[in-house]
Every structure is written in C-alpha cells, then in structure tokens.
Regions:
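Nucleotide 5′-phosphate-binding alpha/beta core
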Residues: 5-84, 90-126, 130-132, 136, ...
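Glycine-biased, low-complexity coil/linker segments
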Residues: 1-2
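Extended acidic/charged loop-beta regions that coordinate divalent cations
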Residues: 138-142
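A short, well-structured juxtamembrane/interface segment
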Residues: 160-168
Length: 168
C-alpha cells in the first residue's frame, strides 16, 4: 500500500466544488483504498476495489463497528487527539484518530464558510447538553473552535445558562 501524502488530502478537502466533487471523491476513494489498511482490507472483502468502483454511489462506507475495533488511520502517526463517539452504556465507543487539530479545524471551518460565508460574521451559540458532559467529543471541539474564530462576545456555550441565551 502507498505512502501518506498530506498535500493530496489538503487539496482534495479544501478545494472541492460541486463540479469536481465526484472526481475528487473517486480519487480520494482510490487513495484511501491504497493507504488505509483497514479500509483497503474491508473493500477487498466486499469486492469493492478501485477496478469495480467507477461512480460515487458505489464507494463503500466503512461500518462504524470497525472504528470500535480497529485503528482506522491513513499512514503511521502519533495522534494529537482521539475523538470518541457517545456510546451508550456498556458499548465500546468508536474512535477518530486526529493527526493535527489545526488541520482538522481548517477542514471544518472551510466547509462551514463555503456554505454560510465568513465565520467571523456569525455568532455561534452552542447548546450541547450530553456532549459537554463527557470528554472526547468532536462536536464540542468544533463548536469551541468556531466560537473562538467568530470573535463575537455573545458566542459561547449556553448549557445551563438559558437566561443569557434568551438575551442573545
């Protein structure tokens, strides 16, 4: 299998348009197949190799169960953080291994701004009860990053402060 190319990943996740989405998705599929051992093996087992996948609708999704049992990553690295799912009692959470938080933030901010415009033009109000009460939530990390980037004094978490939320 191939070598991790961060530049490839960055180009394909920050420069995607409606016009090139399918081509970029197919290119990313081929890249993940070649460089992500868990995903590549899964695709082999279900006979969905790059030779067989020629359209977006045929790209296989990795079952969430594999994120619970395997380290699903592309390339070898020490993660800056590991986000975990909110598993119900007794369940094993799934893991999302993040190499660089700055890169992770760049991707979700660009995605937001592509759809809604400059984040600095928005006030971000976060009311995330079950997420704030546990550690490892990617949603909390995204909300926190967006709150900081918005720069608005009203932006923030309003978990138990409904009175202040009503005033915003």
């Amino acid at each position: 299998r191939g070598h991790w190319d961060r530049g490839f990943f960055m180009r394909n996740f920050t420069d995607i348009t409606d016009q090139n989405f399918e081509a970029a998705a197919l290119e990313m599929f081929r890249y993940q197949y070649a460089n992500n051992q868990v995903y590549g093996k899964f695709c082999d087992l279900i006979n969905r190799t790059p030779k067989a996948v020629k359209a977006l609708k045929n790209i296989p999704f990795l079952p969430v169960e594999l994120y619970k049992k395997h380290r699903v990553v592309t390339g070898a690295f020490t993660p800056e953080t590991v986000f975990t799912s909110s598993a119900t009692t007794g369940e094993t959470p799934s893991n999302h291994w993040v190499k660089e938080l700055a890169h992770y933030e760049q991707v979700y901010v660009k995605g937001f701004e592509r759809e809604f415009g400059d984040l600095e033009d928005w006030t971000v109000l976060a009311l995330l009860p079950s997420y704030l009460e546990r550690s490892g939530s990617s949603l909390v990390a995204m909300a926190e990053g967006m709150i900081k980037r918005s720069g608005k004094k009203e932006s923030g978490f309003y978990l138990y402060n409904h009175g202040a939320l009503e005033k915003v």
